[in-house]
UniProtKB/Swiss-Prot annotation:
Residues 1788-1809 are annotated as: AC 2. Residues 638-1685 are annotated as: CRM (Cys-rich motif). GO terms for cellular component: extracellular space; Golgi medial cisterna; Golgi membrane; perikaryon; proximal dendrite; trans-Golgi network. Residues 1-34 form the signal peptide. Glycans are attached at residues 227, 383, 667, 754, 804, 854, 1642, 1664. The keyword Signal applies. GO terms for biological process: anterior/posterior pattern specification; cardiac septum development; cellular response to platelet-derived growth factor stimulus; coronary vasculature development; cytokine precursor processing; determination of left/right symmetry; embryo implantation; embryonic digestive tract development. This is Proprotein convertase subtilisin/kexin type 5. Expressed in the intestine, brain, adrenal gland, anterior pituitary, thyroid, ovaries, testis and lung. Highest levels are found in the gut, duodenum, jejunum and ileum. Expression is higher in female than in male reproductive organs. Its EC number is 3.4.21.-. GO terms for molecular function: endopeptidase activity; peptidase activity; peptide binding; serine-type endopeptidase activity. FU repeats lie at residues 632-682, 685-732, 736-779, 781-826, 834-881, 884-929, 931-964, 965-1010, 1012-1054, 1058-1099, 1137-1179, 1183-1230, 1232-1276, 1278-1321, 1323-1369, 1373-1418, 1422-1467, 1471-1516, 1520-1567, 1571-1616, 1622-1669.
Amino acid sequence: MDWGWGSRCCRPGRRDLLCVLALLAGCLLPVCRTRVYTNHWAVKIAGGFAEADRIASKYGFINVGQIGALKDYYHFYHSRTIKRSVLSSRGTHSFISMEPKVEWIQQQVVKKRTKRDYDLSRAQSTYFNDPKWPSMWYMHCSDNTHPCQSDMNIEGAWKRGYTGKNIVVTILDDGIERTHPDLMQNYDALASCDVNGNDLDPMPRYDASNENKHGTRCAGEVAATANNSHCTVGIAFNAKIGGVRMLDGDVTDMVEAKSVSYNPQHVHIYSASWGPDDDGKTVDGPAPLTRQAFENGVRMGRRGLGSVFVWASGNGGRSKDHCSCDGYTNSIYTISISSTAESGKKPWYLEECSSTLATTYSSGESYDKKIITTDLRQRCTDNHTGTSASAPMAAGIIALALEANPFLTWRDVQHVIVRTSRAGHLNANDWKTNAAGFKVSHLYGFGLMDAEAMVMEAEKWTTVPQQHVCVESTDRQIKTIRPNSAVRSIYKASGCSDNPNHHVNYLEHVVVRITITHPRRGDLAIYLTSPSGTRSQLLANRLFDHSMEGFKNWEFMTIHCWGERAAGDWVLEVYDTPSQLRNFKTPGKLKEWSLVLYGTSVQPYSPTNEFPKVERFRYSRVEDPTDDYGAEDYAGPCDPECSEVGCDGPGPDHCTDCLHYHYKLKNNTRICVSSCPPGHFHADKKRCRKCAPNCESCFGSHADQCLSCKYGYFLNEETSSCVAQCPEGSYQDIKKNICGKCSENCKTCTGFHNCTECKGGLSLQGSRCSVTCEDGQFFSGHDCQPCHRFCATCAGAGADGCINCTEGYVMEEGRCVQSCSVSYYLDHSLEGGYKSCKRCDNSCLTCNGPGFKNCSSCPSGYLLDLGMCQMGAICKDGEYIDEQGHCQICDASCAKCWGPTQDDCISCPITRVFDDGRCVMNCPSWKFELKKQCHPCHHTCQGCQGSGPSNCTSCKAGEFQDSEYGECMPCEEGCVGCTVDDPGACTSCATGYYMFERHCYKACPEKTFGEKWECKACGTNCGSCDQHECYWCEEGFFLSSGSCVQDCDPGFYGDQELGECKPCHRACETCTGLGYNQCSSCPEGLQLWHGTCIWPTWPHVEGKVWNEAVPTEKPSLVRSLPQDRRKWKVQIKRDATRQYQPCHSSCKTCNGSLCTSCPAGTYLWLQACVPSCPQGTWLSVRSSSCEKCAEGCASCSGDDLCQRCLSQPSNTLLLHEGRCYHSCPEGFYAKDGVCEHCSSPCKTCKGNATSCHSCEGDFVLDHGVCWETCPEKHVAVEGVCKHCPERCQDCIHEKTCKECMPDFFLYNDMCHHSCPKNFYPDMRQCVPCHKNCLGCNGPKEDDCKACADTSKVLHNGLCLDECPKGTYKDEVNDECRDCPESCLICSSAWTCLTCREGFTVVQDVCTAPKECAAIEYWDVGSHRCQPCHRKCSRCSGPSENQCYTCPRETFLLNTTCVKECPEGYHTDKDSHQCVPCHSSCRTCEGPHSMQCLSCRPGWFQLGKECLLQCRDGYYGESTSGRCEKCDKSCKTCRGPQPTDCQSCDTFFFLLRSKGQCHLACPEHYYADQHAQTCERCHPTCDKCSGKEAWNCLSCVWSYHLLKGICTPECIVGEYRDGKGENFNCKKCHESCMECKGPGSKNCTGCSAGLLLQMDDSRCLRCCNASHPHRSQDCCDCQSSTDECILPASDDTVFHEHTKTALLVTSGAMLLLLLGAAVVVWRKSRSQPVAKGRYEKLAEPTVSYSSYRSSYLDEDQVIEYRDRDYDEDDEDDIVYMGQDGTVYRKFKYGLLDEAEDDELEYDDESYSYQ
C-alpha cells in the first residue's frame, strides 16, 4: 500500500524524528480507527446565499457554495485549520455556531468508503486480449453459445426499440474518463462534476497503478457507445452518462450529500458501487446530510417523480459480512443489487441480507468469466468484477425501462423490478414464496433482472397508489438475551388502520428499529416473521465483529414481505450464539424495538396493471404468479410446468394441464407450480390446497392436520394442531417448535424432566413428581413399598433410607437405632416431631448434651471436671497417657488424642477437621463439613455441601445432578454415568448393558450386534447379524455368502420369503425361482420354452421312458448343482446332435433333463431326485415325492400339519393348529412363534397368558388384569377401567366426575379447588348463583354477596333499586346499612333526617330532649324520664312491646323481648335478636337459604338447603321430604334406580323406554347427539344415522340397502325366506302390512288402525274399553299416534294420578299446541313448493313400504355443508317429494355437466347468496 503522505514526509531534508513520528501516526491511526476531522464544514443558514457569504467572511471561512440540491445547506472551507486532524477544530471561527441565522453546523469527518470490486491478486485471473461484442456472455444467454442458463433479455428490450435514449445516468465514484472513445459520444457534462476537486471536470487522477479506474469501468457497462468498433457495448448504449468524482479524496457526509443530490432535475439514475468497509465488523450508514439528500431526491428529484438510486450490495462474503449493517443498501430509497456467477452459483464475495432487491450478472470464482467494459487510458478490460459490476448493469436496465415509460416514479421502478425479476437457475437454499406469491431469497432478492419484461411492464404501467408510512408503537419491554438462547417478542400491528393517512394494508418495505446492548455484537442473529409467516433474517452472526457497542436505533430493512398484509402478529427473534472469542459474561439486552411499515392502503396493482410478461426470448418461467399473460403477444414455448397436453400461452397460468401441481387465485386464475408453496399441501387432482391459518406445512386443510407451525405457534403432536399455548401436560419446545410432552406424572412442566406441578395423588420432589405414599411407605418408581421396619418415613429402601424413625428408635447419622452409640447423646428437641442422636463434642467419650461442658466420661488420660474433660496433670496437650502411665506424643495430625494412631484424635488443629476420630485436611467426598466436623451426606448424594437431598454436589453412579434443584436424579436405565444436559446420553453402561450411540441397551437394537459390551452396526443393508455373518437382509436385498445384495449371482435367484439367494434348478442357467419351469435362460444346447429348458427335439421325445437299468448314484442336490451344471454343459454340447440321450443318473425315469420318477430311497422334488425332502416340504408316501408345505410354513409333517412357521422381522408368522397366521386368533397370544391359549377370563392377551388386553363377559380390564369390578376411583369404559378425573371420588366416565374428594368441588364434570365466579360451593358441588348476584352464599335472590347490576344496592342479600326505610347506602361497597337506632330516616351513619318518637334532630343527630338513664325513656306528656318495662333493657315507651334492646338471656323479637325465638327465627347471640329464617326454611341456624335445619311443607331438603325442585343428580322423596341421590348414571331422575333416569350426563344417551343411560345406544337405535337420547331407527333399518327412512346404514332381514333406504326384496305383505339368489317370498302375519320375517313380532309396517310397537315389532290397536290398560297388548294413543307406546303399569298409573294439577294443565296446553301445529301444517301442505333447478332421479325399482310417518308427508330438503377451511363442497342437495320420488339439486350445475371447481380459491373464502 502506498502511504502517499508518508513518502512525501521522508524526503531528503526533513528531520528524521518528524518522519518517524509521522510514519508511526500513519500506522497507528488506521488501527485505532480514530476520527479524522477536515477543514471543511457543512452549515445550514437561513437567509440565502448572501447571508451565507456574510457569515463565512465574518469568521474567516470561504463559502464554496450550496451542498448539492440541499436548500440552505452550504459548504464552508477554513484555510487556516489543519487539513486533517484527530481533534475537532477550536478557535474564534468556532463561534460561528452562536450566529442567530446558523441553524446547524458540522465539521466534516473523513469516512472510509470501499469500491466494490475485488482484488485480482487474491485469485488467479484470466485475461482476454480481444474483448468484442460476441464475448459479452451476459448478453447472449439465449443464443446457446454460452453456458449461462438465464438471460437478462437485454437484446429483447433493444428489439422493442429501447436503448436508453434521453435517460441520464451518473456514476458516483472516482471519476470517469470522459475522453474514452466508448464514452465521449454519450458523455453528459450536466450530469458530471468533481466534488473532490471542487470543479466540473470528472476526469480521474492518473497514477501508475491505475487506482482510479473504477468509475470508468462502471460507466462503460451502462452507456458504452455501440457500433464504433472500439471496445464494448453498454446496456443502454444511447443513454447519457455522467460521473461525479467523489471517492478520490476525503469522503465526508457533505461530500456524499453533494454527490447523491447533484443536479437532481437532470439526472434520472444515480449508480453507486461503494459503501462502508466490507470487513465483517463495521456498522455504518449515511449521516444526516446524506439521509436528507436521499429523502429530497425521492421527493423532489426528476420533477417530483423521484431520483432512482442503485447501490451495490457489498463484497464482504469472505469476511462473513452482512449487508444489513450497511445503511446505504439497507435504505428504502436505494435499489440494492447483488451478483450471481455465469453458472448461477453464489459468488464467494457476495453478502446476503433481506434488503437486496434483485440480481444481475458478475464474476464468481477466479476461473469464471468476468464483465467486459471500458477501462482507463482509453482501453478495455474483461476483468471487471464484484457487486461493483452488478449495480451499473442494473442501472442500465432501469434506463431502458424509464425510456419505455419516463413517468415511472422511484417506487414504480421498484415495483416493476419485483414483478419481473425471476429465480431462474440462481442457486440458493433459501428461496421461498411469500404470501403475496413472490419468490424471494436473502442472496438474490426477487431474482435476476429481466430487461424485456421490465420495458413491457413499463409500457402499460399505472402509477402505484400513494405511499403510506405507519410507525407502530415502540416495544420498550427490556428482555435479557442469554447465551445459547433466543429472545422472542411478538408485536400485534394494526397497520395504523385507525389513521387513513397512514394506513398500510399492502406492504412494500418493512423497517425494524432496534436498540440492543451486547458484549459482542457479532454473536447476534436477528429474525423477523411477518403475520403471513414470511421469515426474514435481519442479521447473521459476524465472526470478526467484536464490538461491545451493540445497536442503537439501527434500522434493519426487509423487502421479503412485499405485497403481504401488514396487520397481525410480527415476531422478532434475537439469538445469541457465543463465540470462543467472547470474554464477557454479561448478557445482552433487547432495550426496545419498533416497526415502520411502508406501503399502500389499497391494492397497488389495479386491473390495468395486470400486464403480460414476455417469454419470447427466454426459456424459464417468470416466477410471479400474480401476472396475467396476454395471449396476443405470445410467440414462444409453453411454461416448463405445463404437461405435454400443451398450453394457450407462455405463462404458468396458460397451461391446459399442469405437469406437477396447481393452485388457484381469487381472480379464478390457475397457476402451475413444481411443488406447493409453504402453507399448502398436495391434494388430489394435482391441487395445492391451503393449510389451516397457523400451519406452516400440513397434510390436510383442517386445523388438526398440521405437520409444522408458523412462528409464534407450537405443534401439538397428539392433535396435529398448531397452538399458541401448549396444553396441560406439555411444554413449549422453542427449538423444535412443538409442544413437548411432560414426563408421565407431570401436570405442568418447563421441560421433560422439570415438573412444576404434579397430577393428582403425586407430589413434587425437586423437579420430579412422585406418588404421595402414606407414612411408612416410599415410591419405588412403580408403586408404594413399605419402609424398613425402623423407619416412620423414608425416601428409599433399607435402614439407610430413613427420614424419621418409628417409636422406640432414634435417628443417628441417617440411620435408625434403638439407642445412641458411644460419643452420641439423645437430643430431646423434636425435629418434625421425632428425636435424634447428635454427636458429642470431640473432647468427650460420652456426654449428656451438646458442647464441651456436657461430658459424662472422658477418653483415657483425661479427667472429668464439672462436665469437662481435662488433661491429666502429668501430660500436656498433644500427649496421651499410655498403659504404663507415661505421656506419649499424639499423631502429628491430632491436637489432642487418647492413643498413638491417627484414628485416636479427640480434637484437631485449626487447619484440620474432625472425622470419626481422625483429623483430616478435607472431608471425604461423601461427607460435608459443619463446625469443623465431617457429617455424612444424604444417602442419595455421592458428594454434598449440606445434609439434605438438594445439597448434592456429585451423584452416585447412574445418577446426575438436576441443574435447577441440585438433587441427584436417576439416569436413563442402564447408565452408570450421564450428562446433565441429556440424561439419556450415557457416558458408560452398567454391567449387563450394551453401549450404542451414547445409550445403554439390555439387548442390542436392530441391525447391530454385541461385542465386548458394545453394539456395533451390521453391514450395509443387513437386518440381523453377529460379528461373523449376516443372518437376514433388509427388504429388497438377499443374503448371498454372508453379505446382502440386490441381485443374486448367475445360477441363483432371490427367495422373497427367506430373503436369501437360492440355487436355480440344475436345468436352468439363470432363473426367477426354484422350479424347473422358472428358468430365465438355459445352458448351451437347450432352448427356453415357457420357463422350461428343453431339447430342441422335445416334442418328439416327450413321455418316453429313458434307460431304466442305469445304476443310480446318491447325489447331494445342493452340493452337486454347480458341478452338475458344468458337466451338463459339456455333455449337452457333446451330444447335441444325438436324438435320444440317457436320463441323469439320479433319475429312474425322465422327460428330457427332468426326472419323472425316482429309484427306491430317493424322492421326487422339483423334477429332481433327492435323498431326503428339503426344509419346507413333506414326504408324501402315496406319490413318493416331496410336497411343499402350506404357504408360510417352514417345516411340516403333512398338509395342514405345520410344525414351524417362517419368521422374518417384516413378516412374522405364528403357528396355530397346524397352520401359519400373521396374528393369533382371539383368545390366543404369540409365544416363541406359537399361538398359546390366554388365561380365563382374558378375551385377548399379549406377551403371556395372564396379560389381558380385553376381557370376557362382564369382566373389566385394569392394568392387564380382568376383574369383576373396577377399583376405587376408576370406571369401566368399553370394558376397560379408566381412572376417574383428577381429585374425583366417583365417576361414570373418564371425563365425567360425579363426586369429588373432600375439599374439592364439582363443576362441568370435573373437580376444582374452588368454584368459579357466580357459583357457590355446596356438598362438594359448584351451584350457580341467582342471576341477580355477582357472588353469593346460596342459589336464591336474597343470597347475594354483590349485585350483578351495578346500579342496584345490596340489602340483607337482596339486590334492590334503593335502600329501604331505616337504612342508607354505603357508597364504598354499594350496601344498605342500618341507620342509628334513634333515626327513622338517614342519609349516612352520621346524618339523621327524621327521628323516632321522642327524639329530635340536633346537628344531624337524633337526641332526646333530656338525657335519660339506660333503662328509661323520655315521656313527652310528663316532660320527664320514665322507667322502661321490666322486660326491656332500652325502650321507646312503657309497654313490653316498645323495647329497643333486651336484658341478658332474652332476645329481641321485633320490639318484644322473648326467652326463646319461635319457629321461623334463629337466635343471633351477638345482637341478642331473633332474626327471621329464609322464606324456604321452617327452622334454621342463620338467615341464608343455605342455613336451613328443616323445610316448609312442599319443599325438599338437600343438606341445609330447601328446594321446591331438587337439583340435577337428585330426586324429591316425598315421604322423607328430602332430595335423595339419583343413580350415578343419571343426570336427572325420578327415583334411585338406574331405570329411573330422565336425562343423562355428557357421553351418555337416554333410552327413554327403559329410563336408562347408555354409553352406546343398543341395537336398532341411534344416538341423537343434540338431545342426548337413543332414538329408534326406522323399522326397516338394522343400523342407522337418523330416524328417517333414508338414514339406514344396514337393513333388517328381507330388505336390502339402496342409497340409504332399505328396500323390500318381496312385494308388500311378504318377506324373504331362504338365502342366496334362489329364495321364496312368504306372507307376513295378518297383523303386519310389511314384515321382515314370520310371526306377529317381525312387523315393519302396520295396517290401518294399528300402530307399530318398535321394541318387539308388533302391530297393536289403541287401548279402549275392550282393551284395558292392564293388558299391555294395546297402545296408549293419548301419548302418541305416530308409534305404539305401551300403557304404564298399575303402579305407575297410581303414581301418575298423584301428580299435581300443574302437570294436568301442562298436558292440556301441550295438546292445544299440537292441535295448532297440525292446523298450520295442513295449511302449509296446500302451498306450492318451488322446484327450480331440481332434476328427478331414476325411478326406484321397488316401492316404499306402507310405513309412513309425518316426516315423509312434507317435501324435505337436506343440505350438507362443510364449514372447514377450503375443502371441496361437492355434496348435492337431496329432495324427496310427496310421492317418495327422490330428487337431487346440484350445487355447481346440471347433472351431466363436467366437474368444474372454478368457484374454489386458495387465498380467500367466499360465500354466495
